[in-house]
């Protein structure tokens, strides 16, 4: 046997295949025997486990081991050679096993082949693997007893008296590794996962499956009177407890529904079944409904157990609580609140606190009742004095709603909140603590601004008086912001100064400027465009592309700007944008005949169907009473107000009054007040709107619903 220098493993020249091993008297062959085709995984494991030392073989860095007896060999054609160490007697039952490798006359079934090796964890794991593989490869000639059960937790084989007395099972387990130390998880042998190396499934000594238990208990619960709906809603782990304590609980007066509610905390079933007589004796007024409400909570069993020793003391002086009050504290405050209430009952009711039993119950009857009671006991005298000046009712309210943390925040920050710049009264500080707790108090302390939220209510009928406030900035605010940017000496610093001057945030100021046609880049740079450009941008948002050839006078002259605006809105380019196709000159028969056919009513007297573009418009906007306005009154509306209200002319009206509109080949979608429409003489100037026009403008401008502002504020913005 020689030791390889590269790999560090022992290279054995002696195989454990006993029919191929030479007698020990022959000179040792140092050449490695090639693996035979008949060698399986068993022979490979035998070679790995044969780590003994041959005689007179020195070992580097260690003392020479004791001479180990060689492995005896029994050739098929020669009698077995004598061994140096006497062999142990063979078991009597070995002839029952017939295998070509482990025959009755072979010495391969020796019980202890590695008696001289120390029982290390690694060798023990390998021995277990060898033993399991040997069990899988043996072919018994007679039926063997059942496979010994295996411990499910450790994987160790459990032998009873019958299996220990069996010579076959006893010979399969090496005695040298009967009780070795357990191998670490990293050193355990890995089980092969291939299909050809299938391992026998172990038999575990465990309880039946949970589904089997559920089916068995289901039948018991049905026999006890529970409905299938009740059983379906129960937890799986509570079924056996219900079946166990059902008789006791029903004998105490609890119904099936009460037991199902108690089972939400399955530990409470046992507590109620055992301690109900004591609870009834300590609190005679405590009803079963109170017990059910307490027991079904998250830690209801603990609350009931904590209530037993202190129930009598809580009903006595100084608190003199009723059974319902005690049940409320136990249900919501649970065991910590009950224990704190019992411990502090005298301190809370005596001087200097003088709390009433109702106040004590209110503080303790919520999650976190114990720390709230302790905080009130410690901080109430301090919060009553200067500079806090809080009343007892305010402190109790804060403790009931927000708890201990809010009281600590008030004690830490209220002196600062009472001073400038906050200057808050004690009532406001108490209200803030009740609403938001500690977080709200700390936010106000850090300077959280309080913003007024204006809610806009849209009324169905117009009400005489000032116009309602719009959702967003007022016209005065818009004018002030624009004037601030125009009057600023350093445009690049204007945006930063505006944030501080108007006390607003960056997104809010950007939204405000965007509502009047200023982009974000322009706002950050402080370059506010003139009114004409901003108006063109607002028209673009509404879907109207400005004409390219429109003249734009100086914004200093408001009258000139209004005239330019009229020319822009009444230009043929603006009118052509709303039409489906540009106007083309066609013969009279091709331009009028199709329209006359569509305007002609059918034989049944039904009105003709509307135009396709009007159908699309009617799908976007509901028809109102103003859609039946006369054509002449609609023509008198200024173009700068009613551009885009394309439902002012109906097919019926156009049939009744054919005129120059039809010859001009126009449609309701392309109505514009330019060269295509001839106004009747005597009508007012389109540039001077009347009061009725202004009212209609406030009601339905641009076909997008009522707006919240008038024309006056728009003129103020244009002047800025």
From Swiss-Prot:
Keywords, alphabetical: Host nucleus, Repeat, Secreted
Ranges for the Cryptic repeat - repeats: 286-320
Compositional bias segments (type: Pro residues): 67-85
Protein location: Secreted; Host nucleus
Induction: By hrpB.
First and last residues of every Core repeat repeat: 355-389
Cryptic repeat + repeat extents: 390-423, 424-457
Motif Nuclear localization signal 1 per UniProt: ranges: 185-191
UniProt xrefs under Pfam families: TAL_effector
Gene Ontology cellular-component annotations: extracellular region; host cell nucleus
Motif Nuclear localization signal 3 per UniProt: ranges: 583-586
Residue ranges of Cryptic repeat repeats: 321-354
Motif Nuclear localization signal 4 in this chain: 620-623
Keyword Iron-sulfur: no
Motif (Nuclear localization signal 2): 455-458
Keyword Flavoprotein in annotation: no
Region (Disordered), start-end ranges: 13-85, 175-205, 571-611
Family: Belongs to the transcription activator-like effector (TALE) family. RipTAL/RTL subfamily.
Domain free text: There are at least 4 possible nuclear localization signals, both N- and C-terminal regions contribute to nuclear localization.
Function: Does not activate plant gene transcription, because it has too few core repeats.
Identification of the protein by name: TAL effector protein Rip19
């Amino acid at each position: 046997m020689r030791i390889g220098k590269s790999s560090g493993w022992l290279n054995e020249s002696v195989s454990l295949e006993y029919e191929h091993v030479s007698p020990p008297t022959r000179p040792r062959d140092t050449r490695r025997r090639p693996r035979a085709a008949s060698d399986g995984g068993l022979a490979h494991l035998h070679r790995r486990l044969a780590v003994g030392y041959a005689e007179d073989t020195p070992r580097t860095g260690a003392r020479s081991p004791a001479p180990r007896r060689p492995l005896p060999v029994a050739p098929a054609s020669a009698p077995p050679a004598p061994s140096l160490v006497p062999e142990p007697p063979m078991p009597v039952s070995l002839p029952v096993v017939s295998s070509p490798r482990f025959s009755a006359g072979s010495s391969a079934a020796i019980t202890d082949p590695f008696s001289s090796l120390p029982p290390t964890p690694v060798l023990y794991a390998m021995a277990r693997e060898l033993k399991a593989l040997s069990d899988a490869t043996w072919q018994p000639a007679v039926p063997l007893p059942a496979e010994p059960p295996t411990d499910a937790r450790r994987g160790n084989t459990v032998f009873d008296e019958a299996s220990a007395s069996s010579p076959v099972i006893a010979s399969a387990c090496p005695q040298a590794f009967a009780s070795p130390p357990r191998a670490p998880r990293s050193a355990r042998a890995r089980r092969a996962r291939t299909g050809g190396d299938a391992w026998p499934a172990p038999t575990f000594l465990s309880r039946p499956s949970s589904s089997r238990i559920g089916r068995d208990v289901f039948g018991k619960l049905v026999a006890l009177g529970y409905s299938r709906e009740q059983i379906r809603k129960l937890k799986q782990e509570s079924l056996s407890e219900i079946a166990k304590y059902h008789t006791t609980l029903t004998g105490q007066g609890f119904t099936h529904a009460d037991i199902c509610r108690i089972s939400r905390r399955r530990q409470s079933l046992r507590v109620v079944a055992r301690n109900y007589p004591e609870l009834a004796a300590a609190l005679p007024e405590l009803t079963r409904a109170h017990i059910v409400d307490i027991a079904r909570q998250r830690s209801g069993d603990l609350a009931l157990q904590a209530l037993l020793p202190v129930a009598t003391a809580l009903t006595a002086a100084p608190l003199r609580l009723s059974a319902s009050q005690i049940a409320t504290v136990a249900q919501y405050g649970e065991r910590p609140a009950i224990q704190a209430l019992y411990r502090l009952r005298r301190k809370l009711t005596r001087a200097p606190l003088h709390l009433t039993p109702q106040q004590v119950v209110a503080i303790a009857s919520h999650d976190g009742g114990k720390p709230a009671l302790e905080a009130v006991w410690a901080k109430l005298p301090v919060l009553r004095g200067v500079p806090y000046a809080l009343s007892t009712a305010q402190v109790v309210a804060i403790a009931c709603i927000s708890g201990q943390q809010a009281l600590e925040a008030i004690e830490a920050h209220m002196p600062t909140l009472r001073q400038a710049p906050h200057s808050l009264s004690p009532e406001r500080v108490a209200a803030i603590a009740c609403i938001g707790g500690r977080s709200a108090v700390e936010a106000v302390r850090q300077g959280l601004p309080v913003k007024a939220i204006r809610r806009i209510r849209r009324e169905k009928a117009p009400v005489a008086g000032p116009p309602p406030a719009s959702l967003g900035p007022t016209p005065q605010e818009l004018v002030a912001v624009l004037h601030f940017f125009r009057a600023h000496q350093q445009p690049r610093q204007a945006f930063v100064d505006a944030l501080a001057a108007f006390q607003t945030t960056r997104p809010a100021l950007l939204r405000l400027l965007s509502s009047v046609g200023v982009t974000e880049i322009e706002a950050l740079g402080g370059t506010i465009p003139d009114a004409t450009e901003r108006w063109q941008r607002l028209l673009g948002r509404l879907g109207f592309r400005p004409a390219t050839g429109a003249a734009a006078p100086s914004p200093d002259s408001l009258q000139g700007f209004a005239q330019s605006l009229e020319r822009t809105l009444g230009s043929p380019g603006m009118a052509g944008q709303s039409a489906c196709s540009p106007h083309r000159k066609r013969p009279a028969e091709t331009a009028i005949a199709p329209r006359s056919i569509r305007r002609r009513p059918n034989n049944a007297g039904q009105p003709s169907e509307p135009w396709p573009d009007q159908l699309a418009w009617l799908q976007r906007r509901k028809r109102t009473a103003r859609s039946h306005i006369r054509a002449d009154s609609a023509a008198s509306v200024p173009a700068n107000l009613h551009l885009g209200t394309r439902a002012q002319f109906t097919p019926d009206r156009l049939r009744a009054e054919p005129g120059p509109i039809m010859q001009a080949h126009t449609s309701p979608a392309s109505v514009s007040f330019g060269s295509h429409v001839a106004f009747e003489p005597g009508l007012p100037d389109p540039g001077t709107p009347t009061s009725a026009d202004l009212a209609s403008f406030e009601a339905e401008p641009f076909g997008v619903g009522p707006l919240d502002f008038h024309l006056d504020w728009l003129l103020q913005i244009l002047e800025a």
